[in-house]
């Protein structure tokens, strides 16, 4: 809310990417930016999509919520430039079907991903000495802290890629304060995740 007030004071247009808003864990709740900072109503573009929740990324469909009619018109005009494509019909129909009929899928998916997150947390605590996992409040992207083993980030990344055959995102990609972390995507079949964790253990616990 405080950041929203600052943006409002200085006339900043805020683009809020809330594509992961459906994934909060164990009773947590996502607060939409416009609820946290109502003062931004006229200067906010809120971006959501069914692509993460319903695995529809290939259909390239998203929703942009722009309460301010003038800002919305500017957005539409910019989108109509030759470099931008319109949503395809199949994507629009799939988006509507997902939001209107996808509650059962969504609840089952959340339960499954919570199980995956618990699996990673327990495995790291029990079988990867020196490595810790930051318990997530939201999303299925997990942060593993590899600073404990004392290896440079470049060496950890190299070992993961060439020995464990795993491609994680190194923390420094997201800024200097994240150096030493690796980001793991837990949104996959549990057997795939178990195999990845075991290869990680074999690589760092020789």
Cite the ranges covered by each PLM segment.
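PLP-dependent class I/II
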Residues: 1-206
């Amino acid at each position: 809310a405080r950041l929203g007030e600052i943006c409002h004071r200085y006339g900043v247009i805020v683009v809020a990417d809330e594509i992961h808003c459906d994934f909060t864990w164990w009773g947590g709740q996502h607060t939409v930016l416009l609820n946290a900072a109502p003062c931004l109503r006229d200067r906010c573009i809120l971006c959501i999509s069914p692509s993460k929740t319903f695995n529809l990324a290939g259909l390239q469909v998203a929703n942009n919520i722009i309460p301010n009619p003038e800002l919305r018109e500017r957005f539409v005009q910019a989108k109509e430039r030759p470099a931008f494509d319109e949503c395809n019909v199949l994507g629009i129909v799939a988006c509507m079907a997902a939001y209107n009929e996808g509650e059962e899928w969504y609840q089952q998916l959340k339960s499954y991903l919570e199980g995956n997150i618990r699996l990673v947390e327990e495995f790291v605590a029990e079988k990867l000495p020196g490595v810790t996992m930051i318990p997530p409040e939201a999303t299925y992207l997990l942060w593993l802290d590899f600073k404990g083993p004392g290896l440079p980030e470049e060496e950890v990344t190299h070992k993961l890629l060439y020995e464990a055959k795993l491609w994680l995102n190194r923390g420094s990609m997201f800024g200097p304060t994240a150096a030493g972390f690796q980001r793991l995507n837990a949104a996959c079949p549990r057997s795939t995740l178990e195999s990845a964790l075991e290869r990680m253990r074999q690589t760092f616990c020789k």
